[in-house]
From Swiss-Prot:
GO terms for molecular function: adenylosuccinate synthase activity; GTP binding; magnesium ion binding. IMP binds at residues 39-42, 64-67, 161, 175, 254, 269, 333. It is found in: Cytoplasm; Mitochondrion. It catalyses: IMP + L-aspartate + GTP = N(6)-(1,2-dicarboxyethyl)-AMP + GDP + phosphate + 2 H(+). GTP binds at residues 38-44, 66-68, 335, 361-363, 443-446. This is Adenylosuccinate synthetase isozyme 2. GO terms for biological process: 'de novo' AMP biosynthetic process; IMP metabolic process. Keywords: Cytoplasm, GTP-binding, Ligase, Magnesium, Metal-binding, Mitochondrion, Nucleotide-binding, Purine biosynthesis. Residues 1-25 are annotated as: Disordered. Homodimer. It comes from Danio rerio. The gene is adss2. It is an enzyme of class 6 (ligase). Mg(2+) binds at residues 39, 66. Its main location: cytoplasm.
Length: 455
């Protein structure tokens, strides 16, 4: 104590050495997001970036997503696992925003292990957030029943993947969901809550058949297998961001136009697949978001129903579908195809703030004599400056196109921008100029080598 009886700091009261200084930001994450309706080739971009990454994360969605990665001529399919796990040096993290169907997780891993060496030792490389919600078999059954009801009542369904994603996110919002941390705590308490949730669904859908004891038995069998993988996700992420320098990659599932808030509602998924979902789905602040790469297919595709302004229900659409082998990885459904829509991508950019783009499947356009690009929407003859929220309005928009000359040259063997045909270069530059975002990669084939890097 000082003589005055008042212990005063020597610097006149400014005792905090950190006051007025911003705390250090730490490592920044690189984010890869779909800029259209999904199936843009995000897995390929992630696979490319994962070669140098230390950590690859999933922040939202469940096994409704489908990513295909080709390594050493082996085609691996990922739905729930971050596809970067294919790199043996990578730690894969499934964040709290992801919903996990445990049988699906292990089936997916085992299926890929049988295909090739890429996934050997995956269990020691996977970390799961304790706050992630669990998808139960009955969520998947409910998904199917809800689709049937929608079909009967309105004559149209949402085209869900029937993986239980909507029902589990609904349960999460209604605060009746169960999480990984609940499964690993008191199993008796977990069982009670599980039974209560099952009975709620039974009362809503009397035709629903739920094998409560069978499913609980199955869930109990996963406890010891997943326990070593589970961590407090927030603490784990904080340590990763503020520890040694690390290259951290976030692999977005689904895409901007499927986002629950910003997508073509109601024909959307049940999570935020735009950049905001990265922070809420991993438990990290926005200042740790670094590069945000938007993945754009050189034309547009969509699975299921919903407005699609540039859709080509004609020979062009069929050509794109056939040449692009446009069939869903998760559903096996044929994708609807149409011209590139820059109104839609500009909208996705407004939300996500893309720092660069990956333009995929350019080679699919190789045979077209001319290529159209949607550049504006008109409603009642008036150009509108925004992307309509209302589905009925979006159904009615008239698309204004710019027609560009094709290049009628096979680009699949091209490995540098300079080697591309002149008109293909012009197509890329046209996209960059209209969006004000640089194209960093151009995809001209399935393999890793067929991604041309521009800078």
């Amino acid at each position: 104590m000082s003589d005055s009886g008042d212990a005063q700091p020597q610097d006149g009261g400014n005792s905090s050495s950190s006051r007025g200084k911003s705390p250090s930001v730490g490592n920044r994450v690189t984010v890869v997001l779909g800029a259209q309706w999904g199936d843009e080739g995000k897995g390929k971009v992630v696979d490319l970036l994962a070669q140098d990454a230390d950590m690859v994360c999933r922040c939202q969605g469940g096994n409704n997503a489908g990513h295909t990665v080709v390594v050493d001529s082996v085609e691996y399919d990922f739905h729930l696992l971050p596809s970067g796990i294919i790199n043996p040096k990578v730690t894969a993290f499934i964040g709290n925003g992801v919903v996990i169907h445990l049988p699906g997780l292990f089936e997916e891993a085992e299926k890929n292990v049988r295909k090739g060496k890429g996934l050997e030792g995956w269990e020691s490389r996977l970390i799961i957030s304790d706050r992630a919600h669990i998808v139960f078999d009955f969520h998947q059954a409910v998904d199917g029943v809800q689709e049937q009801e929608r079909q009967q009542q309105a004559g149209k369904n949402l085209g869900t993947t029937k993986k239980g994603i909507g029902p589990v996110y609904s349960a999460k919002a209604a605060r009746s969901g169960l999480r990984i941390c609940d499964l690993l705590a008191d199993f008796q308490e977990f069982s009670e809550r599980f039974k209560h949730l099952a009975s709620q669904y039974k009362s809503m859908y009397p035709s629903l058949e739920i094998d409560v004891d069978g499913e609980l038995e199955k869930l109990k069998s996963y406890v010891d297998r997943i326990k070593p993988m589970v961590r407090d996700g927030v603490f784990f992420m904080y340590e990763a961001l503020h520890g040694d320098p690390k290259r951290i990659l976030v692999e977005g599932a689904n895409a901007a136009l499927l986002d629950i808030d910003f997508g073509t509602y109601p024909f959307v998924t049940s999570s935020n697949c735009t950049v905001g979902g990265v922070c809420t789905g991993l438990g990290m602040p926005p200042q740790n978001v670094g590069e945000v790469y938007g993945v754009v297919k050189a034309y547009t595709t969509r699975v299921g129903i919903g407005a699609f302004p540039t859709e080509q229900s004609n020979e062009t659409g069929e050509l794109l579908q056939t040449r692009g082998k446009e069939v869903g990885v998760t559903t096996g459904r044929k994708r609807r195809c149409g011209w590139l829509d820059l109104v839609l991508i500009k909208y996705a950019h407004m939300i996500n703030g893309f720092t660069a783009l990956a333009l995929t499947k350019l080679d699919i356009l190789d045979v077209l004599p001319e290529i159209k690009v949607g550049v504006a929407y008109k409603v009642n003859g008036e150009t509108i400056p925004h992307f309509p929220a209302n589905q009925e309005v979006l159904q009615k928009v008239e698309v204004e196109y710019e027609t560009l000359p094709g290049w009628s040259t096979d680009t699949s063997a091209v490995r540098t921008f300079e080697e591309l045909p002149e008109n293909a270069k012009k197509y890329v530059c046209f996209i960059e100029d209209r969006l004000g975002v640089p194209v960093k990669w151009i995809g001209v084939g399935k393999s890793r080598e067929s991604m041309i890097q521009l800078f």
